[in-house]
Amino acid sequence: KQVNPDMTFWSSPWSPPSWMKVNHYYSVRSNSKVNKLPAEAEITLYEGTDDVDKKFYPKQVAVNDYFIQDPRYLQTYADFFCKFVSAYQEEGVVISRVMFQNEPWAYSIYPACAWTPEGIIRFNVEYLAPTIKKQHPGVQVYLGTLNTNRIELVDKVLSDPRMKDAVEGVGFQWWGGQVLPEIRKKYPNYKYMQTENECGSGTFDWKAAEHTFNLINHYLGNGCEEYTFWNAILCDEGTSGWGWKQNALIRVDSKTGAATYTPEYYAVKHFSNKVVSGTKVLQYKEKGEDNLPVIVFLTPENKYLV
């Protein structure tokens, strides 16, 4: 707060409390190396259906909500969001925005929760949005973080006429970015944001930087007002607690404490050093045969950036 007193935060849970879920466990999928969920518990996810299409993520869609669709549970969970916001406020940390679920279509071995479009609508419209508006009227509710390229799923949620009064914006990440242009064209009245950078595999190289550079162009060029990073600083090989090597903007040697600014850091600086709050996107071109995306900004000082 001393460096940036205007800084605010947004938040989205990976998993509801286990007792609120149909499988009573933090993950959706079983994996003997990282969790203790019995393999037979996965039957709830698809219930024997086999409609698989590898062109999409997820390649198979859950048929059940993993959050118990009981009004008592749904309201209690909405209250939990408010308690979370209040607790951070007491510590001087401003939570300005919440989203109902991190990656509702990631049926993972990590903390996760599968949701159907019907469940997403029900929780956001009937419970989360009205509860937040009542207890924390200054906090925004966004629909996120959407991680599927199955456009029919996103469209089914946003086409419910009640959604426009429940959420102010939509957050996309990973595969969700593929449907951003079409969704924004169909639903132009929402605000849009990118909610998680693709964190790579611990390479910390220029290829990762170029990938992030193109992602920033894509999301900002298609109307997103914010771009969020998953990792700012990691040590050594960038290995997470789950064993996944990832990239970051800054890499620290845990033995010496030496910090290295990675190529990805400079890719980000290319934008953040000039594209300040209030800057507008005038034109955007996706990369084509020339492999070069082009984006034109107008800053609050009426300067053009290309």
Regions picked out by a protein language model, each given a short descriptive name:
Residues 194-270, 280-287:
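Aromatic/acidic polysaccharide-binding cleft in carbohydrate-active enzymes
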Residues 158-170, 218-226:
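Structural recognition of alpha->loop->beta junctions
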Residues 72, 76-83, 123, 127, ...:
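Extracytoplasmic/secreted proteins, especially bacterial periplasmic and envelope-associated proteins
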Residues 104-106, 110, 143, 147-154, ...:
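Active-site clefts of carbohydrate-active enzymes
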Residues 273, 284-306:
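Carbohydrate-binding surface patches
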Residues 8-12, 96-100, 140-143, 168-172, ...:
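Structural recognition of the beta-strand scaffold that forms the well-ordered cores
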Residues 130, 134, 138-141, 162-206:
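Glycoside hydrolase catalytic-domain groove-lining segments
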